[in-house]
């Protein structure tokens, strides 16, 4: 499979088995993927200007929504997928406000691939490629 141009993904997930599974899945689909397990590591990796951030909501003291907002300060076209292990309407509303997709764990592999593809085909993501 040919590598999608300009499709760099940063995954921030504190559960190591989930993180490694998502990294492997997305790499096998042809994406360039960096996976880290903490907010601090994610914040540092935002300097690499990923096209998409997939982040767990709960990341210790901070949360994935804060990380997405921080990333957009550097890269306004950064696409976001926020993942949580619990149903929370407040998190869902905040994700909608940030124009990010919201997924609940466990995330089906086909669903993750579909949501990632949609996020990277969005108009804001297209601005990064052109």
Across the structure, where does each feature detected by a protein language model lie?
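C-terminal output helix
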Residues: 90, 107-117, 124, 128
């Amino acid at each position: 499979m040919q590598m999608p141009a300009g499709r760099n993904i940063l995954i921030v997930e504190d559960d190591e088995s989930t993180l490694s599974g998502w990294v492997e899945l997305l790499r096998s689909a042809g994406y360039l993927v960096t996976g880290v397990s903490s907010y601090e590591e994610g914040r540092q990796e935002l300097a690499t200007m990923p096209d998409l951030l997939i982040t767990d909501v709960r990341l210790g003291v901070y949360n994935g929504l804060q990380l997405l907002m921080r990333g957009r300060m550097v890269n306004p076209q950064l696409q976001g997928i926020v993942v949580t292990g619990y149903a929370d309407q407040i998190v869902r509303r905040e994700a909608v406000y940030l124009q990010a997709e919201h997924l609940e764990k466990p995330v089906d592999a086909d669903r993750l691939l579909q949501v990632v593809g949609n996020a990277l085909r969005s108009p804001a993501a297209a601005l990064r490629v052109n």
